[in-house]
Amino acid sequence: EPLVQPLYWDYPEIEAAYKLTDEFRFGTELLVAPIVDPAERSVQRAKADVWLPQGEWFDFFDGRHYTSRPAEGRRLEAWRDLDRMPVFAKPGAIVPLQMPAEGEALNSVANPRALQVVVFPGAENSFTLWEDDGAAQSKDRWASTEMALRFEGDSAQFSIASAEGATDVIPASRDWTVTFRGIAPEAMHAVRATVDGSAAAPEVAYDAETLSLTVTLRDVPTSAAIAIDFADGLAVADDPVEADAFAVLKDAQMLYMTKEHAYRAIRELGKDALPALSTLEDLHGVGAQTKYQSHMPQPVIQALAEVLTRN
């Protein structure tokens, strides 16, 4: 199958799959909505119109959780700053990425010695990584590595099987960095890793900004099987609405007093603050005192609407 596919291939009966022509599937795990319009100066972000098919979705880069409840899916505006684009992962998505290893050239086309695998919670899934030597035409010159996310009761396990096939086309050992994105931090207190059934000592870290738990295992033979177990499972992280709304307002080019009023309303009302944000537009002030003016740019409201209505 092609790596890039239009949405209407999977959703031929849904009108939105035809309407948003810039959005596409990327592989089996991701939806991508490129930003093709200029940024709005007032919010210092640009937006893409997005259609999310029915179900649960995660922002690939920061792990924020989105819910699309209607059978016809959901349309929204996704606002991002200069170094980001809207990319959404399905529940259970498994996405391998190349990482530069020490001593490796950044532009090397060899199969990497270091890999990052980004994994999302919410559903069981499996993914097979296929690698060749860059010249092979026959299947017998490919190596395959099976990865799987499984749940049993309250526990979860992510596994990386030993490589099979033409293993001479891949490194003899690898550094694995497995990033579980969009999960609650409590998972890091009950993580255990094994290599071929023997206990390993992984490096474990949690990044609150991207809601990501990272487990790193170094110099693991590609002939070995890895298992990462979570006794308490992989719970989806709480939605950091207040922190994300604060970030939008902090960057916005608008009157400071209006920022304070908007943030106070969001802290007190949550998503119910959205209808009130437009009422903060008052360029007349009180009498002749312009210091009481309030200006609430529409793009700022739109960016806040995304944050407030993700779920």
Predicted features by range, described:
Residues 103-311:
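Beta-rich accessory regions
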Residues 1-190:
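Catalytic core of carbohydrate-active enzymes
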